[in-house]
Amino acid sequence: MEEEGVKEAGEKPRGAQMVDKAGWIKKSSGGLLGFWKDRYLLLCQAQLLVYENEDDQKCVETVELGSYEKCQDLRALLKRKHRFILLRSPGNKVSDIKFQAPTGEEKESWIKALNEGINRGKNKAFDEVKVDKSCALEHVTRDRVRGGQRRRPPTRVHLKEVASAASDGLLRLDLDVPDSGPPVFAPSNHVSEAQPRETPRPLMPPTKPFLAPETTSPGDRVETPVGERAPTPVSASSEVSPESQEDSETPAEEDSGSEQPPNSVLPDKLKVSWENPSPQEAPAAESAEPSQAPCSETSEAAPREGGKPPTPPPKILSEKLKASMGEMQASGPPAPGTVQVSVNGMDDSPEPAKPSQAEGTPGTPPKDATTSTALPPWDLPPQFHPRCSSLGDLLGEGPRHPLQPRERLYRAQLEVKVASEQTEKLLNKVLGSEPAPVSAETLLSQAVEQLRQATQVLQEMRDLGELSQEAPGLREKRKELVTLYRRSAP
């Protein structure tokens, strides 16, 4: 009678199977009496094949070891018999199988081999890989199924992939930008490099036409509000007068010995470069002009005191204002960026000179102005001078206009003034130290050349008819230049 767990098998080639253990063992037939028969056993992975003969190709029984729990030693009454048994696992309908080995060592080796076969039979379901196409992922890039469970924290590999993808995206975005680096700001020391750039000027009210110089009173000009005098470039410069007065306080202590010449009929644009000579030429310039100021001051004081209370600053500067207004009405308003900025620090406004002359009376000579704090700052660089222009020019830098003939004249006068000051300083150094005739001659020759060029420019401008009214004043200034040159000779 065959057992339920034993299967009849047909002919199988023995060499085609992997044999883990083989040998002759007595096997019990099972029943009450239990007959023991010699059988040739082959252990192949999780199967135990039973043959009647070693050379026989026909398998009598096939035992599936996955249906059994374990193999252990059988407690027999007579210990001299080496028997072991295969115990079935619960839930299976197979029966236990008993074996008897010839020796004890053979019994132990078979018990160990059969237990390994049982483990392989139980793990057979885990070793097999079954591919179910219905469970495939819908998206190629998803590495796991989107389940309802809570999402696990990202691993280091996942974070590295996210960082690399982000960096690739940033690099791809940078391809569209032509210059993604930080802007480089190169400081420019030269003023002319910033000239081509033009900024839009704010909208300003239209300028009012100038009145006749005789109908304009200095008292009205002083009392006008800021909004009315903003369009005129001459009067708008009074807004910058506190800055120019503060800038001129430091040079006032150094040049306290110098004296300012009196006011004349020449406009301020011509007086900028001739007004304040160096301390060495101040006495000669004063001797020719102090008689003019008292006459002009006393002649203006009489008609004004009857109408309004006396205001000393407008009285002193009335002729100066009239001449400058008449000159600007005849020639038109010049470019604010070139005319109002001067090398020696003086600008066209009348108010920077008011604190210096308000200390004295209208009849006092201009020598009282030596203690003034409004002396021009000689050594101040051009970019720090206060700008004299309208409110719109103060808010935004105006466009650069081509130089007019009067502006060229003004620049030529500035160059003559600067050259004369440099020559005077160098001559003072030469006279104070040991004589150096070679260097003195070189300096004098350069000064003569610059004076010759300036005189030629003035002559050309006068021939054009643009300076017909100021011809007497120019002659006097040219005489002063000749006097300066003669005094500076060693």
Curated annotation (Swiss-Prot):
Coiled coil: 439-481
Gene Ontology CC: one annotated term: ficolin-1-rich granule lumen
Regions that span the bilayer: none
Xref: PROSITE patterns: PH_DOMAIN
Signal sequence annotation: none
Keyword Phosphoprotein: yes
PH domain residues: 18-119
UniProt entry keywords in alphabetical sequence: Coiled coil, Phosphoprotein
Protein's name in the database: Pleckstrin homology domain-containing family O member 2
Lineage per the UniProt record: Eukaryota, Metazoa, Chordata, Craniata, Vertebrata
Primary gene name: PLEKHO2
